[in-house]
């Protein structure tokens, strides 16, 4: 009897171990520190080759972690950039916190200031940005009332960014001029629209690769919401996704959403938590997929850059 009890308990233990195996993290993989000695890392973004760019914001520089595993400086100074995102043309969009602007940076590191205010009022401080993928739409006949016909054409998607208020010691500006909102910048890079006005402190933001859904974290209220994106960038069908806010966000090939703060919390598309990734830092700011195969999860956390090998991979919209 004692033998059978021991056998049964052993089988239970094995079953528990198997049940605990992650469906998204590569077998045997652990969080590895790739680089350190930074002041505060933020805004990781992956280019088309798989290189990951991130900011060391207090030191006013953008760094590059190459696919070959080497660290280099891409831009210094960089307007104290925070959140970053690449567009399809290879430009790097940056939330330039020094003067509360939105920048577009070319491959040589030359920046263009795209936005610096909204209807004459200064932004609080653009924080995180997501570039909506281009989408295909059928052309129309000469009559606007006719249904779409003919070949499909590619339509640029524009971009969304959050604008919370975090007072910086280096600001020389006056007091806060606007509420903390979320904005949509149309593909002409001139027309900007306020699309979310009812959140306490919007921060992390990410969308799906088909450009249909947008996730926005209200870090001030400790919640994350999901919205449906209309063709003109307007948002509808607001729905609570999970009871957790986030500093930064990304999405994987299975539609799972990654939230940051105390480590990395992963939720499936239904909003159920499926994984908690512990990071040996006081605060985890942001996250993205990178590498040649997009199967390395890059984590910017306080003084370090970390990596974790995954089973799932990143998508173009992350």
Predicted feature descriptions by range:
Residues 18-318:
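Sequence-structural signature of mature extracellular/luminal beta-sheet repeat domains
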């Amino acid at each position: 009897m004692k033998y059978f009890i021991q056998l049964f308990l052993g089988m239970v233990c094995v079953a528990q171990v198997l049940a605990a195996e992650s469906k998204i993290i590569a077998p045997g993989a652990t969080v590895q520190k790739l680089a350190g000695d930074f002041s505060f890392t933020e805004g990781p973004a992956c280019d088309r080759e798989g290189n990951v760019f991130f900011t060391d914001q207090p030191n006013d520089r953008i760094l590059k972690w190459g696919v070959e595993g080497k660290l280099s400086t891409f831009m210094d100074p960089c307007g104290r950039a925070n959140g970053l995102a690449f567009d399809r043309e290879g430009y790097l969009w940056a939330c330039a916190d020094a003067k509360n602007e939105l920048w577009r940076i070319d491959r040589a590191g030359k920046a263009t200031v795209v936005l610096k205010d909204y209807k004459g009022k200064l932004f609080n401080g653009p924080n995180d940005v997501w570039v909506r993928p281009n989408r295909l739409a059928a052309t129309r006949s000469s009559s606007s009332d006719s249904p779409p016909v003919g070949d499909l054409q590619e339509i640029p998607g524009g971009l969304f960014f959050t604008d919370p208020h975090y007072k910086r010691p280096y600001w020389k500006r006056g007091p806060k001029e606007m509420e903390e909102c979320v904005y949509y910048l149309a593909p002409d890079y001139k027309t900007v629209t306020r699309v979310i006005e009812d959140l306490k402190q919007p921060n992390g933001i990410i969308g799906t690769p088909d450009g249909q859904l947008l996730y926005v974290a209200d870090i001030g209220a400790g919640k994350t919401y999901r919205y449906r994106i209309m063709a003109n960038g307007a948002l509808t069908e607001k729905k609570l996704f999970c009871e957790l806010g986030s500093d930064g966000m990304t999405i994987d090939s299975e539609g799972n959403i990654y939230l940051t703060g105390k480590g990395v919390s992963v939720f499936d598309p239904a909003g159920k938590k499926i994984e908690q990734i512990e990071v040996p830092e006081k605060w985890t700011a942001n996250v993205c997929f990178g590498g040649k195969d997009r199967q390395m999860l890059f984590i910017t956390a306080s003084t370090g850059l970390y990596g974790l090998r995954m089973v799932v991979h990143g998508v173009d919209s992350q």
